[in-house]
Amino acid sequence: MVQNRCYRVHSKVSLPPRRPFEKERMDRELKMCGKYGLKNKQEIWRLQYYLARARKTARHLLTLPEDDMKRQFEGAALLRRMTRLGLLDESKQQLDYILSLKTEDLLERRLQTVVQKLGLSKSIHHARQLIFQRHIRVGKQTVNVPSFIVRVDSEKHINMSPFSALVQGGKPGRMTRKKLKSQKSE
């Protein structure tokens, strides 16, 4: 029998809802899935868990006195992280604003949504397919994860991959290669 010697401790990345059949929440999640082109509700729960942890940290830091070193240091780091992700503006640099963040704010920063808003795709579902099929890159890195959270400074570097068959002068697609092969054999 083969023994596994590489044990890993995985932390939780999402939490299912406490009440599984709450009608208002289910309708709200279904609308979000349609609007943002999500595969399933697990993607919503993952982002909600991320925001819940950020809010929990902010609430803990707000209980500390203003001049506490931990509050200043960790609070500044949390605000910097949220600003870099585009969740907070430069004008909203206080821990109170982290408590008012919504899931939709984080859904707006997903690569799938940003690609659609930049006009690189025809629809939100088309954006998901382009990302999965490796037609989109961020900077010099090809990204094939639709849930990739786009930073503010990376947003201007999102474009079509030069190796994509959809780009003029890119690698030819499967049918184009087949036609070229049949023309050569004739």
UniProtKB/Swiss-Prot annotation:
Residues 167-186 are annotated as: Disordered. One of its GO terms (molecular function) is rRNA binding. InterPro entries: Ribosomal_uS4, Ribosomal_uS4_CS, Ribosomal_uS4_euk/arc, Ribosomal_uS4_N, S4_RNA-bd, S4_RNA-bd_sf. One of its GO terms (biological process) is translation. Keywords: Ribonucleoprotein, Ribosomal protein, RNA-binding, rRNA-binding. Gene3D superfamilies: RNA-binding S4 domain. Residues 109-184 form the S4 RNA-binding domain. GO terms for cellular component: cytosolic small ribosomal subunit. Pfam families: Ribosomal_S4, S4. It comes from the Eukaryota. PANTHER family: 30S 40S RIBOSOMAL PROTEIN, 40S RIBOSOMAL PROTEIN S9. NCBIfam families: PRK04051.1, uS4_arch. This is Small ribosomal subunit protein uS4. It comes from Naegleria fowleri.
